[in-house]
Amino acid sequence: MDISASPSIADGPVYTHQTVRLDSGLDLECGVHLAPLEVAYCTYGTLSPARDNAILVCHALTGDQYLAERNPLTGKPGWWSRMVGPGLPIDTDRYFVVCSNVLGGCMGTTGPRSICAETGKAWDSEFPPITMHDIVAAQAKLIDHLGIDRLFAVIGGSMGGMQALTWAADFPDRVFAAMPIATSPFHSAQNIAFNEVSRQAIFADPDWHDGHYRDFGAIPARGLGVARMMAHITYLSEEALSRKFGRRVRHDAATAVPASSSPSLFGEMFEVESYLRHQGSSFVRRFDANSYLTITRAMDYFDLAAEHDGDLANPFRKSQTRFCVVSFSSDWLFPTSQSRLLVRALNRAGANVSFVEIESDRGHDAFLLEEPDFDRTIRGFIAGAAEHAALKAGER
């Protein structure tokens, strides 16, 4: 087992970035034994002597382990730096926070870019199919490695919320509290459809090369960029788009988008067009197309009820976890109706569950943005859970 570590105090809370190599590997649900297993992760704060103050934060589809410090690849602040840190709702002065790159990702955890032990070459598009259960099983191996028997909390938004629910279902004795945010216990037909259009955009790119594009010194940038553009629309709301862009045009269209983007064929470019092109072009510089395909498919497979005789209550009947389910009023990707369905199932299972719908016009991405009511909800739930757990947070 090899570990590389790099502690830092720059641009955020004190953290350590590590990659752990587990030679024992991981048995995937598809039947493939994946070995070795590498998991890249960051930790923030200090684990208490009782090892009872650990919070696992799970990232969304295109997130990574750089939760609260400057991302070394993009140079931008961590994706939840406004939420995680000293004195913030997820307080690193009190809690030991862990965030790992998911299985199938492209930021250090085993995924399509990794070398297949049998062939000596990168997996690329031949990386085996994975599920949300596989993703969580890899995280569980990391938590075992850290010597943590029970997580105080698992928190995640969007696909991160799917992971939080899977933790509570698959490890009912290892999670005291769970906060699934802007998520669902299944991936809807609409969301599967969005993902399929994204995948087809990648497949249609002439640089796709059946997923072995790196052998040709290429990446399917056009297709992956279009996939990101379309996905980004689903993360916003009509109100947010109207407020941010309206029907305004860019009079400097020639310099408004990177040179690699196709020029507008119809005169001046709308600001929303320029914005989407920027999102697409910046995304392809940091994310791998095969990882995008692998992870979106894992999301599509996700359906906790179908795996338990069609009854969503069944996976939680043995769970001792305390839940706080959070939705946002303008989120049409994971609408409040799906959160209510989850809450009703948790009630049937006899779980301790609270539900909060945050009024916001910012759409699905609201959980990543400044929302005072949401901040108070997270802070309050964590404090209440700590009280019920008799957690002596801050005594380290």
Swiss-Prot record:
Main location (coarse class): cytoplasm
Active-site residues, as the UniProt record annotates them: 158, 331, 364
Catalytic reactions on record: L-homoserine + acetyl-CoA = O-acetyl-L-homoserine + CoA
Enzyme Commission number(s) from the entry: 2.3.1.31
Binding site for substrate: 228, 365
Domain of life the protein comes from: Bacteria
Locations listed in the record: Cytoplasm
InterPro entries: AB_hydrolase_1, AB_hydrolase_fold, HAT_MetX-like
Keyword tRNA processing: no
Gene Ontology molecular function terms on file: homoserine O-acetyltransferase activity
Pathway: Amino-acid biosynthesis; L-methionine biosynthesis via de novo pathway; O-acetyl-L-homoserine from L-homoserine: step 1/1
Domain AB hydrolase-1: 53-370
Cellular component GO terms, alphabetical: cytoplasm
Keywords assigned: Acyltransferase, Amino-acid biosynthesis, Cytoplasm, Methionine biosynthesis, Transferase
Enzyme class: transferase
Gene3D superfamilies the record matches: 1.10.1740.110, alpha/beta hydrolase
Protein family membership: Belongs to the AB hydrolase superfamily. MetX family.
Record NCBIfam families: homoserO_Ac_trn, PRK00175.1
Self-association state and partner proteins as the record states: Homodimer.
Free-text function comment from the UniProt entry: Transfers an acetyl group from acetyl-CoA to L-homoserine, forming acetyl-L-homoserine.
Name used for this protein in its record: Homoserine O-acetyltransferase
UniProt organism field: Gluconobacter oxydans (strain 621H)
Organism lineage: Bacteria, Pseudomonadati, Pseudomonadota, Alphaproteobacteria, Acetobacterales
Gene from which the chain derives: metXA
